[in-house]
């Protein structure tokens, strides 16, 4: 299966955006990097480095099933809402790249469900997401009036959190789940590069930048609410104390 590659070695080949003609925004300052810095500044203001012990202990089987269930739910919803964007994505380059991402998210859902099946869970029918997760993933992510607003929310803020989370949490995972996420992480990194390309090419006016920044900030706030909801859920299930550091869900 042919994939798109932006830089460095990888499985994605034949970048459809590598045309000789310059496109709008190609020579613009790297607003993407500014947005990354903005998110990291906000994150550093609320995270307590003394609570990093969350990442230094193995998951219990119960918590692992809960975490994998969340990830499967997230990946399935991402496949569905990104697929829903395609009919209203006027930019041909973004359309091609987002269509590739839909397939990736579907495969990630399958990988998570396989890991759950090895633990006796074959369906999410009896698993209910927290209200904060539904507001964040089911309501907010599918919204956005333009491609750059949608990509700023999910492929920037969301995928940045996911990449960081998976790398940090990986040592806590059993070997079979590590192998699954070793397949997922490069895709998440590609999705960030996809987002950067779209933002650089199509976020070109001051109004564009203002709308993108607003989406980034609101997504960050919903992500934080989602993490707190995860802690409350773990405490309610007797898996962890309410004061434990929350995982970077996504």
Predicted feature residues:
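Non-heme di-metal
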Residues: 2-250
């Amino acid at each position: 299966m042919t994939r798109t590659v932006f830089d460095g070695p990888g499985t994605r080949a034949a970048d459809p955006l590598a045309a000789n003609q310059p496109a709008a925004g190609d020579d613009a300052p790297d607003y993407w990097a500014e947005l990354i810095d903005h998110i990291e500044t906000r994150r550093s203001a609320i995270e307590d480095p003394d609570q990093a012990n969350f990442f230094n202990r193995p998951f219990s089987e119960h918590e692992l099933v809960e975490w994998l269930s969340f990830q499967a739910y997230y990946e399935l919803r991402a496949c569905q809402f990104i697929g829903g964007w395609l009919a209203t994505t006027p930019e041909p380059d973004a359309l091609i790249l987002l269509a590739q991402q839909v397939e990736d998210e579907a495969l990630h859902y399958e990988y998570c469900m396989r890991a759950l099946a090895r633990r006796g869970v074959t369906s999410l029918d009896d698993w209910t997401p927290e209200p904060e997760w539904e507001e964040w993933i089911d309501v907010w992510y599918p919204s956005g009036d333009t491609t750059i607003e949608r990509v700023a929310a999910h492929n920037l803020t969301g995928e940045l959190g996911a990449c960081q989370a998976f790398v940090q949490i990986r040592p806590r995972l059993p070997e079979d789940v590590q192998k699954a996420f070793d397949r997922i992480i490069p895709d998440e990194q590609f999705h960030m590069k996809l987002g950067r390309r779209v933002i650089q090419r199509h976020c070109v006016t001051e109004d564009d930048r203002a709308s993108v920044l607003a989406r980034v900030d609101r997504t960050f706030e919903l992500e934080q609410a989602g993490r707190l909801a995860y802690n409350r859920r773990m405490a309610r299930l007797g898996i962890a104390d309410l004061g434990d550091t929350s995982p970077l869900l996504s």
